[in-house]
Amino acid sequence: MKVLVTGVNGQLGYDVMNELNKRGHEAIGSDITESNEYFNEYVQLDITNKEAVEKVITEINPDVVVHCAAWTAVDLAEDDDKVEKVRAVNAKGTENIALTCKKIDCKMIYISTDYVFNGQGETPWDPDCKDYKPLNVYGQTKLEGELAVSNNLDKYFIVRIAWVFGVNGKNFIKTMLNVGKKYPQVKVVNDQIGTPTYTYDLARLLVDMAESDKYGYYHATNEGGYISWYDFTVEIFKQAGYATEVLPVTTEEYGLSKAARPFNSRLDKCKLVENGFKPLPTWQDALSRYLKEIEY
């Protein structure tokens, strides 16, 4: 199977490439930079350039495109001078890929987010829920990307994830390990609830999907139950052997961020098992393996 992966400089794209290579598939990575130090099979691609997208994907002629590239700086996306750029990447870039996939009759896997919903209540979001109410620019543009995929293609997977961490990039765990080293106590919000997603585990699932034709919308995070960022931090410090005290605070007490954050990031993952996909391991287990991987 020949697979093109976008955004391979990021946490998820990096792990998807490694998983594809491990399974003996022909994996071609792409990103906006000229070259990539990790992968030989690499092509520079600016997904906002429609002609370039069409040319590159048509020439490669993959069986599947795994589209991980995105603008993910949630707060920065709120700046007036950034909104069009964010939309160009998350919405238009995704549409460029979807239209080319349609032309060459190729599967597409699009990575999305719980931010397409309003983040309220306590009920886990169903993958087929169409009650979209994004809280911020990032969520709105990712939703536009989802619609570009679902309106143009039949052979697609839209996979929503949350609270992502991986080896190749910045994430909440790395931030907390640094902060916990410097200060005797840290304040972390306890009223935003969800489940972490380890990109190494998610990559395995995405390649399983690429090998199948069980198309549709899915939610995929690690198992292990729904937690707050406070709970997550307590477990991070426990596993890392930190004595740092963690103080729970509300989002309101913590202070405003530019972009509104969802209180309810609970994602219902039942559809994975219903369609024969193997769920991800628990987040506690994922955290333990991750800390070993980054040699903590």
Predicted regions span which residues?
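N-terminal Rossmann NAD(P)H-binding glycine-rich loop of SDR-like oxidoreductase domains
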Residues: 1-23
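SDR active-site strand-loop-helix element
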Residues: 6, 30, 65-69, 108-113, ...
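Catalytic helix-loop patch of NAD(P)-dependent Rossmann-fold dehydrogenases
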Residues: 84-96, 116-159, 164
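Conserved C-terminal active-site "lid" loop/helix of NAD(P)H-dependent oxidoreductases
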Residues: 228-234, 250-290, 294-296
